[in-house]
């Protein structure tokens, strides 16, 4: 029996953990899946996608810098992809129409709620950043019914635009926006959705957003403690998590969308930590 073909598309892509994750899922579930990494030319993402599906490919994951292009390219979008304005998962429906989905938000919610036991319902949440990473996760976070969510960003107008967009769908939740300097804590949960940790930088917020019982979550991940999580630990936080679990959970949701089988994730996350 031949394996069904899947891949992750990005540029650059050599660093991607997705092939490793999906090969572990395939081993665990017994699904006949072959999963590779494809570096698409920056100027021809669409051609790369069409070539993949024209040659029998079954599904794609999409990473930077192509998530918005994937959303635009699709003929149909799931509701969560529509809200996210970006897609990290593509597949063909029964009519061979390209469908865009976004599993990032489900990924962070499952990691926080199920893997780390973080209560989201009724929580006071601070989300740092207003780019594509944050837009991709806000909908599923709000679906968990936190008491309030503050979106803080260097450019306040971008945070305000997100608050307006998601406020229409979640009118029962206090959703507000501000600049980094205007944040007033403390919070039950602080999520860093900026890429500052990758550059060794920090968002310009003060430590009063953190109490000892504040959960801090950096959507970036690394072998060492991320810059943001180290800052949080230095200012009294006890529970800090990086985004590796989110990466595995969003991959598991994509696997489920494609195959109808939901892989078990904790062993895969542990294996990646020790790779």
Curated annotation (Swiss-Prot):
Keywords in alphabetical order: Amino-acid biosynthesis, Aromatic amino acid biosynthesis, NADP, Oxidoreductase
Disulfide bond entries: none
EC number from the UniProt entry: 1.1.1.25
Catalytic activity: shikimate + NADP(+) = 3-dehydroshikimate + NADPH + H(+)
Cellular component terms per the entry's GO annotation: cytosol
Residues binding shikimate: 16-18, 63, 88, 104, 221
Active site positions: 67 (proton acceptor)
The keyword Zinc-finger appears for this protein: no
Pfam families per the UniProt record, alphabetical: SDH_C, Shikimate_DH, Shikimate_dh_N
GO biological process terms held by the UniProt record: amino acid biosynthetic process; aromatic amino acid family biosynthetic process; chorismate biosynthetic process; shikimate metabolic process
Domain of life: Bacteria
Recorded metabolic or biological pathway in which this protein acts: Metabolic intermediate biosynthesis; chorismate biosynthesis; chorismate from D-erythrose 4-phosphate and phosphoenolpyruvate: step 4/7
Family, as annotated: Belongs to the shikimate dehydrogenase family.
Subunit structure: Homodimer.
Entries under PANTHER family matching the protein: BIFUNCTIONAL 3-DEHYDROQUINATE DEHYDRATASE_SHIKIMATE DEHYDROGENASE, CHLOROPLASTIC, SHIKIMATE DEHYDROGENASE
Record protein name field: Shikimate dehydrogenase (NADP(+))
Species per Swiss-Prot/TrEMBL record: Marinobacter nauticus (strain ATCC 700491 / DSM 11845 / VT8) (Marinobacter aquaeolei)
Gene: aroE
């Amino acid at each position: 029996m031949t394996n069904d073909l899947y891949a992750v598309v990005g540029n650059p892509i050599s660093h991607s953990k997705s092939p490793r994750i999906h090969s572990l899922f395939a081993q665990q579930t017994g699904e006949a899946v072959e999963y590779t990494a494809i570096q698409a030319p920056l100027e021809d993402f669409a051609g790369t996608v069409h070539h993949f599906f024209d040659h029998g490919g079954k599904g794609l994951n999409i990473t930077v810098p192509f998530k918005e292009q994937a959303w635009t390219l699709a003929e149909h979008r799931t509701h969560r992809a529509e809200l996210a304005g970006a897609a990290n998962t593509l597949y063909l429906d029964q009519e061979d129409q390209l469908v865009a989905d976004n599993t990032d938000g489900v990924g962070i919610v499952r990691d926080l709620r199920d893997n780390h036991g973080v209560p989201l319902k009724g929580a006071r949440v601070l989300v740092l950043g207003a780019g594509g990473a944050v837009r991709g996760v806000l909908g599923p976070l709000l679906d968990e019914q936190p008491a309030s969510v503050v979106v803080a960003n260097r450019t306040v107008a971008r945070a305000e635009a997100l608050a307006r967009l998601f406020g229409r769908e979640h009118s029962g939740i206090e959703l507000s926006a501000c600049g980094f300097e205007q944040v007033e804590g403390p919070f039950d949960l602080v999520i860093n959705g900026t890429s500052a940790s990758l550059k060794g930088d920090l968002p310009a917020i003060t430590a009063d957003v953190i109490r000892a019982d504040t959960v801090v979550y950096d959507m970036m991940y690394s072998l060492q403690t991320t810059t943001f999580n180290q800052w949080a630990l230095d200012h009294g936080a006890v529970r800090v998590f990086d985004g590796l679990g989110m990466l595995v959970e969003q991959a598991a949701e994509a696997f489920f969308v494609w195959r109808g089988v939901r892989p078990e994730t904790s062993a895969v996350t542990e294996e990646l930590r020790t790779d």
